[in-house]
Amino acid sequence: MTVQLEELLKAFELNNPYLKFYLNKNDGHMALVTEIPGDDKAENEVTANPDAYIKLPTQADLDLPEMIKGFVPLMKDPKQRATFQQSIEAGKTVSQLERELKDMGLVQFWYTFQRMEFRKIAKKWCEDNHIDYEE
């Protein structure tokens, strides 16, 4: 089975605490399961055949707060870099930090960096799980 790396990247970008993505190990089909706390878990293709699926990295696995810290050294303007570092240290959320990057005119650079990091994670995930992938 071969998976398209682009499909994994799309799943990573949509990732949130309530959406879990799974890959069918037999045919490469992607399944989406919504997990809302307090909701009864409905039967779905993943729960019906758990051995056929492998869970993609979750939002926690992707660790955007840590990833955004890795972006700071790439910021060219020392003043922006220092201000942004202070915002990180103040404990601002990723969405608040992204708004700051937008105000600084750097949000597209962040999204490009994030996508490159997602690509590395996707490749490693495929390799760790013995899944072939195409770029």
Please provide the spans of the model-predicted regions:
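Extended, charge-biased low-complexity segments
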Residues: 1-48
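Short, exposed beta-strand "edge-strand" segments with a Pro/Gly-rich flavor and a Y/T-containing core
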Residues: 1-3, 58, 88-89
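Polar/charged alpha-helical tracts
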Residues: 7-10, 99, 128
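A structural signal for short, well-ordered beta-strand segments and their strand-loop junctions
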Residues: 22-23, 55, 134
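Aromatic-anchored, charged helix-turn/loop surface patch used as a conserved interaction hotspot
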Residues: 29-85
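Intrinsic disorder and flexible coil segments
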Residues: 52-55, 93, 126
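Amphipathic protein-protein interaction modules
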Residues: 63-117
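Acidic, proline/glycine-rich low-complexity IDRs
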Residues: 110-135
